[in-house]
């Protein structure tokens, strides 16, 4: 925006950089943010599914997501993991192996008996840092809608909600369509 012979950037700026290209030389300079650290995707392996449940009764969306994870994992030859957190749930964990999960990671502690965003987010973070799955699927349940954005923000990664189509690229990028 030009005001009193001076250029200024306001809230309407769309970052098109036309002012840099077309404006007077040196009047506006575009400074890029620091380059983000590149991630070695070969270190990230597996597709994880968050097991949503109430008192050990697994929500049906979990089984749907396991099926989709299995389909996606087969395209890139990766394992399917299930992340199961709660209290007195170990006996239910084995059941998930019959639905195509290669490995179930169980966090069974009294503190996890009821959903608390802080503790569940911390457990999720611990799981991700230790096991480095290349993608995580979480159901659009009451808990999932609270937990997924918090975990994505904590891990500084993306999140797509309410996807209708999921596809896995050969380079392990997850393509989502809403």
Describe every region a protein language model picked out.
Residues 1-178:
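N-terminal glycine-rich FAD/FM-binding segment characteristic of electron-transfer flavoproteins
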